[in-house]
C-alpha cells in the first residue's frame, strides 16, 4: 500500500471522528432544547393555572383610603402636602408622624391629585414608585443598588452576550424608574448613609452617573445606548416623598434642608372612632356605638382600629351575621392582649401641691402633665428630691460627646432660686417634686408649673385645677418662651382645662383660633401665681415681695 492510500485512510478516519463529534453535539443541543422547551411549557402551564386562582379582595384593601377625605384628622398635613406637590413647582417632601395615621396613604394619593391640576408638571402617565428603606439593601462594590442603580461588569455577568464581549451593562434603579413622577421612600430615616449621600447628588443633578472600569469611550463594540448612559447619565428628574416615624432631629440635616417638612399628628379618640366607623361601612358591617367607643378606647392609631374591625367582621361573617357584636370586639381585644388607653384629665377639685403642667412628645402631640409637690418642715437642713425626670443627658457628634445635667434638673435649680426671693426657703423643708406616669421628663418648659407647685405646698395654698400652664422660668422670675405651644394648648383643652398659661413671647394670632379654652400670656411668675392660686390674700403677699425686690434693686 502506497503512502498516498495510507494518508487517505487516516484522513477518512479523522473525518469520521470529527463528524461523529459534531453530530453528537448537535444531538445534545437538540435534546437540551427539547428538554428546555418541554420544561418551559410545563412552567407556563403551571403559571397559567396559578393565575386562574384568585381569592376575594382582602378587607385591608377594601378599607384602604381612596381619597383624601378618607384620611381622618390630618387636614393640616394634607393641606401642606398639596401645597408642596400639586402646584407648578413641586418640591421634595418629608412626612413626619406616628405609625398608622395615613402618611403612606396620603403619599399615594397626592400624585393623582397633582395630575388634575393643569399647571402641574406631572403628566397623566407619571409614575409612583414606592420603596421601603428598611429593605433597600445595596452592595458596596456597586454590583447591585435598587435605589440608585448599578453596573453589571463583565466579570459578574456570567455567560451573557455582553459579558462575553467584555461590555459593562448598566442597570437602572428606583430614582430612574420614578423619572417624571414621584419616588416614595417609606421609613426614609432607616436609609443607609451611603445611599442617602448618593441620593443627595441625584436630587441636585436630576440624573444618575454610573462608573465602570470596563467602560471606554473608544470601544466601538459597546452599544450606542450604553455610551449615552455613561456619558450623559440616566435621567432621574423626580420628586421625593419620604415618610418616617422618627423625629426631625434624627434625620440628616443635608436631606432635611432639601425637603419641605410636613407633620401628621397622632389621632385622638374621636378620630379613631371615626376611622373604625368608616371601616365598618366599607366592609358592609353594622356596628353599635358601644363597639365604636370600645375600639376608640383600645386602638392607638387608625391601623389598629381597622385591624380590630377586620377581625371582628371576620368573626361575624363566619357566624353568618351582618353586624358586629360588642362581644366580638371584647373577644378580639382580650385575645390581642390590648390595654386601654389612659387619657389624662384634670383633677376634679383643687388640691394643694398638684399642678397641671403640659408636655409635648413627638410631632404635634401634646399631653397633660401632672406635677405633684409635697413640702414637709425639716428638723435640720431640708432636702429637695425630684423624681420622674431625666437626671443627665448626653449631647455631641460622632467625634465628641458632652454629658451635662439635664434641662429639667437645671430648671429645678432655677425654681428654687426664684422662690428664695419670695421668702420660700427650701432649706427649711423636705421638698419632693414628682412627675408621675413612668415616662422620664426632660426640658425646661415645666419651670413655672414646678414653681407653682412648690409655693403651693409650702404655703398650703390650693391650686386652681382648671388651669394648665407651660413656660420656662429664669432666675429673675421671668417666663421664657418654649416649644410646641399649639400642641400643648390642644392637649390642655382635651384634658378639660378652662384656662392655659403660656409665655407672652409664644403668643401668636393663630392661637386665638383655638376655641373652648382661654389662653393667657404672661411675662412674670407673679402673674402666674395671681391666676393660679385660690386664696384672697395671695395678691397682698405677692405685692409685699415685689415691693421688697424693687427696693433692693433701687438700693443696688
Pin down the residues of each PLM region.
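Conserved C-terminal helix/linker of AAA+ ATPases
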Residues: 309-310, 315-340, 344, 503
Amino acid at each position: 500500500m502506497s503512502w498516498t492510500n495510507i494518508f487517505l485512510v487516516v484522513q477518512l478516519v479523522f473525518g469520521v471522528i470529527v463528524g461523529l463529534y459534531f453530530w453528537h453535539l448537535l444531538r445534545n443541543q437538540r435534546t437540551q432544547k427539547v428538554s428546555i422547551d418541554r420544561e418551559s411549557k410545563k412552567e407556563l402551564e403551571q403559571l397559567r393555572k396559578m393565575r386562574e386562582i384568585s381569592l376575594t379582595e382582602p378587607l385591608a384593601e377594601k378599607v384602604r383610603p381612596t381619597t383624601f377625605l378618607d384620611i381622618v384628622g390630618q387636614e393640616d398635613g394634607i393641606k401642606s402636602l398639596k401645597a408642596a406637590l400639586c402646584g407648578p413647582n413641586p418640591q421634595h417632601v418629608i412626612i413626619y408622624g406616628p405609625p398608622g395615621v395615613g402618611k403612606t396613604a396620603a403619599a399615594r394619593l397626592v400624585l393623582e391629585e397633582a395630575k388634575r391640576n393643569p399647571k402641574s408638571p406631572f403628566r397623566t402617565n407619571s409614575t409612583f414608585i414606592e420603596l421601603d428603606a428598611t429593605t433597600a439593601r445595596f452592595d458596596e462594590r456597586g454590583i447591585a443598588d435598587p435605589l440608585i442603580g448599578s453596573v453589571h461588569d463583565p466579570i459578574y455577568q456570567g455567560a451573557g452576550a455582553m459579558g462575553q464581549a467584555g461590555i459593562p451593562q448598566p442597570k437602572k434603579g428606583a430614582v430612574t424608574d420614578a423619572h417624571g413622577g414621584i419616588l416614595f421612600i417609606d421609613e426614609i430615616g432607616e436609609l443607609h448613609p451611603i445611599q442617602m449621600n448618593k441620593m443627595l447628588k441625584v436630587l441636585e443633578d436630576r440624573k444618575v452617573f454610573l462608573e465602570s472600569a470596563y467602560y471606554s469611550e473608544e470601544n466601538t463594540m459597546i452599544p450606542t445606548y450604553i455610551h449615552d448612559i455613561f456619558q450623559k447619565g440616566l435621567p432621574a428628574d423626580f420628586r421625593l416623598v419620604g415618610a418616617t416615624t422618627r423625629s426631625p432631629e434624627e434625620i440628616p440635616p443635608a436631606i432635611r434642608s432639601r425637603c419641605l417638612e410636613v407633620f401628621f399628628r397622632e389621632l385622638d379618640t374621636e378620630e379613631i372612632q371615626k376611622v373604625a366607623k368608616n371601616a365598618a361601612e366599607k366592609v358592609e358591617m353594622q356596628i353599635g356605638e358601644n363597639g365604636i367607643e370600645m375600639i376608640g378606647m383600645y386602638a392607638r392609631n387608625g391601623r389598629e382600629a381597622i385591624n380590630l374591625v377586620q377581625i371582628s367582621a371576620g368573626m361575624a361573617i363566619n357566624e353568618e351575621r351582618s353586624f358586629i357584636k360588642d362581644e366580638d370586639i371584647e373577644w378580639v381585644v382580650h385575645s390581642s392582649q390590648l390595654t386601654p388607653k389612659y387619657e389624662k384629665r384634670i383633677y376634679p377639685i383643687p388640691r394643694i401641691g398638684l399642678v397641671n403642667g403640659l408636655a409635648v412628645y413627638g410631632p404635634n402631640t401634646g399631653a397633660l402633665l401632672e406635677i405633684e409637690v409635697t413640702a414637709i418642715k425639716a428638723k435640720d437642713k431640708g432636702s429637695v428630691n425630684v423624681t420622674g425626670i431625666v437626671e443627665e443627658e448626653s449631647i455631641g457628634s460622632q467625634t465628641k460627646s458632652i454629658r451635662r445635667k439635664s434641662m429639667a434638673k437645671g430648671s429645678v435649680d432655677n425654681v428654687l432660686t426664684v422662690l428664695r426671693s419670695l421668702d420660700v426657703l427650701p432649706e427649711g423643708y423636705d421638698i419632693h417634686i414628682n412627675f408621675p406616669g413612668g415616662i422620664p421628663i426632660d426640658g425646661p418648659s415645666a419651670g413655672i408649673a414646678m414653681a407653682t407647685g412648690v409655693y403651693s405646698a409650702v404655703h398650703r395654698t390650693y391650686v386652681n385645677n382648671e388651669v394648665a400652664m407651660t413656660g420656662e422660668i429664669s432666675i429673675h422670675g421671668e417666663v421664657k418662651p418654649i416649644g410646641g405651644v399649639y400642641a400643648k394648648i390642644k392637649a390642655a383643652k382635651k384634658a378639660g382645662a378652662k384656662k392655659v398659661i403660656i409665655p407672652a413671647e409664644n403668643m401668636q394670632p393663630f392661637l386665638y383660633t383655638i376655641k373652648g379654652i382661654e389662653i393667657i400670656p404672661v411675662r412674670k411668675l407673679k402673674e402666674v401665681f395671681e391666676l393660679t392660686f385660690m386664696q384672697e390674700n395671695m395678691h397682698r403677699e405677692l405685692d409685699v415681695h415685689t415691693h421688697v425686690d424693687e427696693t433692693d434693686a433701687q438700693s443696688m
